Amino acid sequence: MLSPDTVADIRAALAPHLARDLKGRNDFEGEKTNRVYALMAKSPVFADLAIHPLALAFAEAELGPSCLLSALLAINLHPGETVQPWHFDDNGAKVPRPRPALGISAFWAIDDTTEQNGATEIIPGSHLWDGDIIQGAVTPSDFAHKGADHGDGDRADAIKLVMPSGSLAITKGTLWHRGGANRSDRPRLIITPQYCVGWVRQLENMALAVPAEVASQLPERARELIGYSIHPPFMGHVDGRHPRKLLREHAPRKLQA
């Protein structure tokens, strides 16, 4: 899906951010994991990932043409990282299950992801499950503490997303999954754009994460995805006006329509 040159460009754009070596703050983020958030504001190469035709086609088919980019982040698992708690990505809206997905997640493999280096684990068919909590699922304490062992959540029905560098996997937001344990001697890097229906609040506050002067230089579809758009009939307006009109007024010389 991604050429070696594109993968190299992504690595180069991420390098200064990964060099800071900021590790996760809790069990969910991962004590031995780098997470780089707000990628849309950091390099045009990440906007290109968010609007990649195949990923976007899945998002629009599942979520509608007014879908939004909920988050865009890099996840870099270091050797020794343990398994993440089980979770599903569109849980933030707290709409009871079973239900249609309110989001989808794309997983771009920048490194080869293998059974040994922390390939994402998924439970096939779990997007159809009801609201029962499974063994090893994320709990509120996972966002406040480090050091928990979620190995008791291992399941015979789970599979690992083994993917060569440059490949793409897409899952519904209702699918139970978790980051795997990295038992190798090298980090494992992926980038995950997450999309949501146009009426659900985004995980990342894109209005603050992507300054207007940066948004004005993005491709038009990327601007729409971060919120310079309208969910019918008028959700997302600014003082009764389409947000793209205000962006043109605030950055008229930079806007690339």
Per-region residue spans from a language model:
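Conserved double-stranded beta-helix
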Residues: 129-170, 174, 180-257
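Residues that flank catalytic or metal-binding motifs in active/ligand-binding sites
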Residues: 32, 42, 70, 102-104, ...
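Short, solvent-exposed loop/turn segments at secondary-structure junctions
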Residues: 2-4, 74-77, 113-115, 127-128, ...
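Short, conserved beta-strand element in jelly-roll/cupin
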Residues: 96-115, 162-165, 170, 194-197
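A short secondary-structure junction signal
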Residues: 82-88, 96-97, 116-122, 131-135, ...
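Active-site region of the double-stranded beta-helix
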Residues: 65, 79, 92-100, 109-119, ...
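Non-heme Fe(II)-dependent double-stranded beta-helix
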Residues: 1-97
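Conserved hydrophobic/aromatic beta-strand scaffold that supports enzyme active sites
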Residues: 1, 85, 105-109, 122, ...
